[in-house]
């Protein structure tokens, strides 16, 4: 009997080492780190203490990285400083709507620069982030909004039609439509 493992033609990582350019401070078994250097990204991760909150991690990074890019998407970037400022504005806006700590806020967005701003703003306001798949049908969206009890929703304009079909069927009182 022949097994698949007897017929592999795979090259082991140790055999590939010679095919990558060598950089004195980049291990040859991790060639992707070269691109990290190009973009000024850390090549190692400093693990926070077990009791560190996500907000504490962001606060530390705001202070540490300021004007450096936090996110890059479709040719645009968002610095840590801008993320800090804009997410604080979102948090203040949510509070100005009368929403309270613990209220649920739905966010129906793909991976775009608006997402981290809104997500962090929701968390900073002490509210609960409800991620919503932007590809949901109106029936799926209605179910998630009802199930979560979301009182507000941030939605990219491309997906607003889906929400329009269910807007009168749930507890959502505040709708923020974002442009790309």
Spans of features found by a protein language model:
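Structural core segment of the AMP-binding/adenylate-forming
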Residues: 2-23, 96-97, 124-180
């Amino acid at each position: 009997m022949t097994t698949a493992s007897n017929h592999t033609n795979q090259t082991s990582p140790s055999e590939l080492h010679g095919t990558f350019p060598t950089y004195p401070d980049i291990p040859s078994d991790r060639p992707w780190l070269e691109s990290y250097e190009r973009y000024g990204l850390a090549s190692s991760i400093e693990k926070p203490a077990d009791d560190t909150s996500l907000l504490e991690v962001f606060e530390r990074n705001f202070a540490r990285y300021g004007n450096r890019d936090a996110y890059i998407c479709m040719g645009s970037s968002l610095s840590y400083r801008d993320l800090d400022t804009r997410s604080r504005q979102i948090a203040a806006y949510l509070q100005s709507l009368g929403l309270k700590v613990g209220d649920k806020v739905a966010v129906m967005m793909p991976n775009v620069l608006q997402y981290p701003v809104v997500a962090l703003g929701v968390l900073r306001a002490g509210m609960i982030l409800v991620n919503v798949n932007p590809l949901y049908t109106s029936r799926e969206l209605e179910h998630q909004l009802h199930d979560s009890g979301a009182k507000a929703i941030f939605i990219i304009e491309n997906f607003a039609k889906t929400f329009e079909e269910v807007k009168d069927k749930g507890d959502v009182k505040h709708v923020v439509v974002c442009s790309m």
